[in-house]
Curated annotation (Swiss-Prot):
Coiled-coil residue spans: none
UniProt xrefs under InterPro entries: PyrdxlP-dep_de-COase, PyrdxlP-dep_Trfase, PyrdxlP-dep_Trfase_major, Pyridoxal-P_BS
EC number of the protein: 4.1.1.86
Residues with the N6-(pyridoxal phosphate)lysine modification: K319
Keyword line: Decarboxylase, Lyase, Pyridoxal phosphate
Keyword Glycoprotein among record annotations: no
Cellular component GO terms, alphabetical: cytoplasm
Species annotation: Acinetobacter baumannii
Family label: Belongs to the group II decarboxylase family.
Pfam families from the UniProt entry: Pyridoxal_deC
SUPFAM superfamilies: PLP-dependent transferases (SSF53383)
Lineage summary: Bacteria, Pseudomonadati, Pseudomonadota, Gammaproteobacteria, Moraxellales
Gene of this entry: ddc
Record protein name field: L-2,4-diaminobutyrate decarboxylase
GO biological process per UniProt: carboxylic acid metabolic process
Recorded metabolic or biological pathway in which this protein acts: Amine and polyamine biosynthesis; 1,3-diaminopropane biosynthesis; 1,3-diaminopropane from L-aspartate 4-semialdehyde: step 2/2
Amino acid sequence: MVDFAEHRKALLCNDAQSIADYESAMGEAVKAVSAWLQNEKMYTGGSIKELRSAISFQPSKEGMGVQQSLQRMIELFLNKSLKVHHPHSLAHLHCPTMVMSQIAEVLINATNQSMDSWDQSPAGSLMEVQLIDWLRQKVGYGSGQAGVFTSGGTQSNLMGVLLARDWCIAKNWKDENGNPWSVQRDGIPAEAMKNVKVICSENAHFSVQKNMAMMGMGFQSVVTVPVNENAQMDVDALEKTMAHLQAEGKVVACVVATAGTTDAGAIHPLKKIREITNKYGSWMHIDAAWGGALILSNTYRAMLDGIELSDSITLDFHKHYFQSISCGAFLLKDEANYRFMHYEAEYLNSAYDEEHGVPNLVSKSLQTTRRFDALKLWMTIESLGEELYGSMIDHGVKLTREVADYIKATEGLELLVEPQFASVLFRVVPEGYPVEFIDSLNQNVADELFARGEANIGVTKVGNVQSLKMTTLSPVVTVDNVKNLLAQVLAEAERIKDAIASGNYVPPID
């Protein structure tokens, strides 16, 4: 027999008991988060081995109920999670979040709107369109509706290279009737499969290669060019590469420029890249997933000069905009280029709806069902105002330059790349230490500090050198916070360096 009372209690609906349970459990959850925030330890989950033994999924026929399940998750998940707001959590583009973003998440989750069709998110659809228009004006595209919120940079970059490829093939290939070739209708011409190329720098985000492979073009379709000493795309090498490809009969569909590379935070010379792509008739996509935050900067906006010249742009708001994951956007300069991915489904975006101006946003997205993540950015901008928001973004740039100066002046530390944005690449180099052990030393310093829950420092490569990385984007981290962290780094290196050199060291990750 169906127990509708229990069904109603389990759903978030207008049932009195459901509402009471929701209010009570949400109150308990907020209290638990508050307690977790006040614990000053960055991480208390232990090693991978310890976590693996502690975590167990426990389904049952009867269930354990809301309260018991919540208490179990407070201990199993919340208390074992990384505190991304902690001043020593600097490894990745993994930001602390705005209070308004967290409040917006409650509204997003409770209403459960879906952004594919207007009748599934009436207010949200119109709000997203307005926010896209505002973002377009901020980047310099001008007013318009060509753009959509996405899950993040990988999806936005996929949209950029997908549209660029199909635009390129339509421009350079004809079907049997002499019309521009439609990849959407007819697939990829065999000749185009071999000859269409996308260019990016050697430090571009891996999603460029990954997306081209998913599009059926393979890694072979991506040509990388070197970077200069500032980790920016070498524009002389770019021009030589494009000339060489053209001479070979290849067609460059797109050049992906980066505004804020993942490791160095490098911003490529956007205006010069646009000049070169214009010369060869190629699309220019800018991956500004990180550096795009500077469109709100009070001080450093000029670092993005030329962004307005691009054909498409990736923005991520769950990086330097301090929004909860996930929240990104794709902006398209010329709305006509959406034709390469347009698909009409009678039950979502019918011709009738389009004739009457109904904003069914599925037409602009690779996703169908999609969260109203735009609400987080909307509420943050309206509540903070652009000046305060810009100040919070600018802090990371200023802090990074101060940290770089400190590293250069500190014995035992070496700055590997002069920073541009909000990332510091450095390493520990003890005086007289055997060079063959320096990479291992730096790797294990980071691993040791994380295993004890004291710091989360990134590990990457600069050329062939093992590098430590601090992504200094937090608007509340101070120079003194970072100095204290660097003192821990040096102390840890001193503690383990002899064991590493003698071969007696046991890595904490084992």
